Amino acid sequence: MKIMRKNHPMLKIINHSFIDLPTPSNISSWWNFGSLLGICLMIQILTGLFLAMHYTSDTATAFSSVVHICRDVNYGWLIRYLHANGASMFFICLFIHVGRGIYYGSYVLSETWNIGIILLLTTMATAFVGYVLPWGQMSLWGATVITNLLSAIPYIGNTLVEWIWGGFSVDKATLTRFFAFHFILPFIITAFVLVHLLFLHETGSNNPSGLNSDSDKIPFHPYYTIKDLLGILLLLMTLIILALFFPDALGDPDNYTPANPLNTPAHIKPEWYFLFAYAILRSIPNKLGGVLALILSILILATFPLLNTSKQHGLIFRPISQTIYWTFVANLLVLTWIGGQPVEYPFTMIGQIASIFYFTIIIILMPVSNTIENNIMKF
């Protein structure tokens, strides 16, 4: 078996990627989230495939088909809730994965980092079009509000919105194409994941100390396969508890009302994992400015390799940068909370302050703290 694993053309690739892969001996549990994201993606594709077998992408029957899945299909309710809550677990793992990358300076592996940003954007797009499919109130109005933002683009905005809608409002054509996008995007994500891994294995993994670990590597299997297995079991346990006991904890009650274009919900808001970006969008009174801030809130991650001036790798030995990092995390949680609140005082004011702080921390405070720490350490 060992000879076959090392010589067979197909098994050799798998062997070099998952079995005999040289891995730093000191990587912590924060490095588990890459494999957890892979498991989340597999769960989403499998449950999504079974849901697609029973779903109809027509405005007249979409809501009823989801009800049919929950009531009449064998374990349809379980598949639906695993898929809906699986998306939340996916984003929790995704945010922690990005957060770990920032904390431990993984952004210096710029190719892997940039593919990761593309993956984040593609996953957000997939989740957005997926939220429209049940055709509840929040599905319709969320799709209307978010797609309407494109009308802020000068000259071509309105034409672009109508082109995406396939008409003059979010209707049957929009739902059909969103279903097509939601079906194909996970496979595009899978392709990007392979490219992400390809670039990662070119350079090798980062590690908590931030030092070169070429002199101290161990094989990925069995050491990290066992470690990942524990993470996978904890993830599955959390997901199953969520799907069985609290299936609607992270959803919106408005989405249990069939879509009605004549009745606007009191508070239109996206799923919880988009609330931080939604708060940044709402904090700017100008429509185009809000859209640009929304896009920049994600694309600003690409500036990390450019703004990094520290002579040390990661934040593990840098207390000033650590303080700024955890302030940034707290600020993100504030933005997430504000995104779910109504547009009124004091929430608008808090949102504006938190949005300014979000960009200030990344563009000004982090590079300044790098320079201060370099001077203290006399680098």
Curated annotation (Swiss-Prot):
InterPro entries: Cyt_b/b6_C, Cyt_b/b6_C_sf, Cyt_b/b6_N, Cytb/b6-like_sf, Cytochrome_b, Cytochrome_b_C_euk/bac, Cytochrome_b_N_euk/bac, Di-haem_cyt_TM. The keyword Mitochondrion applies. It is found in: Mitochondrion inner membrane. Binds 2 heme b groups non-covalently. Heme b b566 binds at residues 97, 196. Its cofactor is heme b. Heme b b562 binds at residues 83, 182. A ubiquinone binds at residue 201. Keywords: Electron transport, Heme, Iron, Membrane, Metal-binding, Mitochondrion, Mitochondrion inner membrane, Respiratory chain, Transmembrane, Transmembrane helix, Transport, Ubiquinone. One of its GO terms (molecular function) is ubiquinol-cytochrome-c reductase activity. One of its GO terms (cellular component) is respiratory chain complex III. The chain crosses the membrane at residues 33-53, 77-98, 113-133, 178-198, 226-246, 288-308, 320-340, 347-367. The keyword Transcription regulation does not apply. One of its GO terms (biological process) is mitochondrial electron transport, ubiquinol to cytochrome c. It is a multi-pass membrane protein. Heme 1 (or BL or b562) is low-potential and absorbs at about 562 nm, and heme 2 (or BH or b566) is high-potential and absorbs at about 566 nm. The cytochrome bc1 complex contains 11 subunits: 3 respiratory subunits (MT-CYB, CYC1 and UQCRFS1), 2 core proteins (UQCRC1 and UQCRC2) and 6 low-molecular weight proteins (UQCRH/QCR6, UQCRB/QCR7, UQCRQ/QCR8, UQCR10/QCR9, UQCR11/QCR10 and a cleavage product of UQCRFS1). This cytochrome bc1 complex then forms a dimer. Belongs to the cytochrome b family. Component of the ubiquinol-cytochrome c reductase complex (complex III or cytochrome b-c1 complex) that is part of the mitochondrial respiratory chain. The b-c1 complex mediates electron transfer from ubiquinol to cytochrome c. Contributes to the generation of a proton gradient across the mitochondrial membrane that is then used for ATP synthesis. This is Cytochrome b. The gene is MT-CYB.
